[in-house]
């Protein structure tokens, strides 16, 4: 079973350039042919690409050093050596590549069509054919190939989810994501069941529109400072378009809980408070009283748009999804349902008018 690993350091070595050749022509009736040593091949590059089937960096725990193939040496008849084969490393979409020595962000994978050449292979050495001069007709030396680039990298994964579910421990985040997506997180009736983010895909409008949703481990006061499971997973909601603040509807003070959660997000990254959000009251099946549910909603409605659900009993889940469509994805869905035709205006330029 995969373990969720979202940060790891690795070393990569591009391929060494191939050596130039020391070689001389062998011609009939020519005792000493001229130099014809070919150049060495370029070393292979180290290339990083995203893989949509990967959700963790755990494969890089067992192996931390990676080296591309060296370029092949040159040969006679001025033939260059073959280029070394590139080494391709795959990472989950959302992975950021940092230079571990400088801390600089080198690349951010936000599209599955991207590719990043992180280390380039060394140039091949020149063969002895390059070194023939009027005073040295038979050079017996060639250049060695150059070293390939070396990089010490930190791979840091930030999930590319459209919606993030944020809540206290045991609010029902994993149950909710299991009901509205095809994800199958571990679910239990105790705090901190979720020890790593879960990612699922929500299909809407007959599957013409999809979005991804992630739940992160429960947040407690001080999470942004490392308390509880800490800030290690907060970065996975940095890219979301919208946030669901999920609460156990029987909480004694939902307003204070919301204030605490938003304070933790703000301490970690103030930009998160600018994301649109919904307040979701879960577990309303506990009392099974519609009027009481209305009273609970009324008490917190001044905090934002509120939806009351029971994830476990699948109550009001469609209402929740409709609100998510409206609050988070209204423009995107409208563009899909009502595409604008690309029409060109009729030209009234006199030059376009011809007499028959």
From Swiss-Prot:
The keyword Glycosyltransferase does not apply. GTP binds at residues 167-174, 192-196, 215-218, 282-285, 310-312. Keywords: Cytoplasm, GTP-binding, Hydrolase, Magnesium, Metal-binding, Nucleotide-binding. The keyword Cell membrane does not apply. NCBIfam families: Obg_CgtA (TIGR02729), PRK12297.1 (NF008955), PRK12299.1 (NF008956), small_GTP (TIGR00231). An essential GTPase which binds GTP, GDP and possibly (p)ppGpp with moderate affinity, with high nucleotide exchange rates and a fairly low GTP hydrolysis rate. Plays a role in control of the cell cycle, stress response, ribosome biogenesis and in those bacteria that undergo differentiation, in morphogenesis control. This is GTPase Obg. It comes from Leptospira interrogans serogroup Icterohaemorrhagiae serovar Lai (strain 56601). The gene is obg.
